[in-house]
Swiss-Prot record:
The modification N-acetylmethionine is found at M1. It comes from the Eukaryota. The modification Phosphoserine is found at S382. It is found in: Cytoplasm. It holds the Pfam family Pkinase. This is Casein kinase I isoform gamma-3. Signal peptide: none annotated. ATP binds at I49, G50, C51, G52, N53, F54, G55, E56, L57, K72. It catalyses: L-seryl-[protein] + ATP = O-phospho-L-seryl-[protein] + ADP + H(+); L-threonyl-[protein] + ATP = O-phospho-L-threonyl-[protein] + ADP + H(+). Autophosphorylated. The active site is at D162. The gene is Csnk1g3.
Amino acid sequence: MDNKKKDKDKSDDRMARPSGRSGHSTRGTGSSSSGVLMVGPNFRVGKKIGCGNFGELRLGKNLYTNEYVAIKLEPMKSRAPQLHLEYRFYKQLGSGDGIPQVYYFGPCGKYNAMVLELLGPSLEDLFDLCDRTFSLKTVLMIAIQLISRMEYVHSKNLIYRDVKPENFLIGRPGNKAQQVIHIIDFGLAKEYIDPETKKHIPYREHKSLTGTARYMSINTHLGKEQSRRDDLEALGHMFMYFLRGSLPWQGLKADTLKERYQKIGDTKRATPIEVLCENFPEEMATYLRYVRRLDFFEKPDYDYLRKLFTDLFDRKGYMFDYEYDWIGKQLPTPVGAVQQDPALSSNREAHQHRDKIQQSKNQVVSSTNGELNTDDPTAGRSNAPITAPTEVEVMDETNCQKVLNMWCCCFFKRRKRKTIQRHK
């Protein structure tokens, strides 16, 4: 691959350092003289391990540190490229608790590549592992962390707009942060503070849906511009999903996706908070009432919301010892293929069987532009296969197998979902 030609395409920025620390480069990358597919000078590209909303995910390895990484790839000719924007948002977020490290951004052949740290399983994967119900203690430990996580994102002038269990991951097993809940995938994030005027974005209506229908706020269903309040309401819906095992608006049938989203929104509005939170501590209802009453421009009282749950946590006599429901169950590790707990596969299979339609139609809303597509489960995505040239040697089979059971910080689809499109 002609590296000099690549240099002409983009202006030079920062090169990835040998240490593997964060860098942004326009250095042409691809097949090295040794026939290994590379991203930047450090990162060897391995096998495909999944697909995200807008591209493909590869296993990678930092040749200087021997650490495994995740490499997110997006075709340069994508109709709505967003990987560079996501990279910018990650840089804007910096090194906060529960924010994955980004090691590198630059071209890789006909693709843009972002290199991130590997993390552990998602909350959805762990939910499957735990018979699709979490205890109150586990939900509270998750909730307290995620309120802080969302507060941090908001403090960087971003709203997240993509709350779902698949986007929250624990750390890599064996890592010191393995019990920390991380937030990933900022492809749908948006600046709610205008970088030029330093003012809050204006209130608007008739907006296209952005987010995941199951968890998004009622106001999002109504076509209202999202702000900080909507991220917190979506979290509240997710907390109740974990406690209840399902939500009242799951499994609704409709002739078209648009009608289905309408039904989901109607059912959310028609379900009283008291009914949604019935048989659970009052604090769950108090949380939802508070976030639904917030004004579009209003800064949420994160301390109040955290205190709701920390007080309940203390009153129940719990200890914040990170003893989640999944502790003691067999999880993947980065040092070898570990036999999966049979309960995970059986629970997942049973769930997929009884909820097949519901899962396939609980869509992720894409940030690409286009029309509703009811047939193509990858409509609006850039999921074209990335194939190494025949002379390129990808990571060897043995090493790849050691980490193929690892989840990584860019959520890859465990279930393909049909998409609808939105305009920013």
